[in-house]
């Protein structure tokens, strides 16, 4: 929630939260949408996507229950195991954007999935560590 709040503040946009309860590993049930998403284009943030169940369930709730106009998801790590690709393909998500912290598998073919490179930032961080310069300034 803290990361989403920080993004909302930087973008000067309102914040909504999808409250979910995890019943067991790799499954969750969407419980509530806290905030108004009706007729809005939603950016859904998560740390990682494994099987895609939570992400796709949240997107579905945002559209069907919350009335969102569209949903784009962003996550740091795309594990994408099991049914993840098919779930994303079949979902209401318009686009899913991952960082390339986990290499994209060549067999993964889904027009909704995009990757952003972290190579330049990692290289800069390594250089700063070597030069004994603050790495935290990269993120301010």
Model segments located where?
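PRPP-associated nucleotide enzymes
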Residues: 1-140
């Amino acid at each position: 929630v803290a990361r989403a709040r920080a993004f909302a503040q930087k973008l000067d946009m309102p914040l909504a939260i999808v409250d979910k309860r995890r019943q067991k590993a790799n499954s969750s049930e969407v419980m509530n949408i806290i905030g108004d998403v009706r007729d809005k284009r939603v950016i859904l943030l998560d740390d990682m996507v494994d099987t895609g169940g939570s992400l796709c369930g949240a997107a579905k709730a945002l559209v069907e229950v919350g009335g969102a106009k569209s949903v784009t998801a962003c996550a740091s790590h795309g594990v994408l195991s099991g049914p993840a690709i098919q779930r994303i393909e079949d979902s209401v998500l318009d686009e899913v954007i991952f960082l390339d912290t986990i290499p994209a598998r060549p067999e993964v073919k889904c027009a909704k999935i995009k990757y952003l490179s972290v190579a330049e930032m990692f290289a800069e961080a390594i250089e700063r560590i070597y030069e004994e310069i603050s790495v935290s300034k990269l993120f301010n």
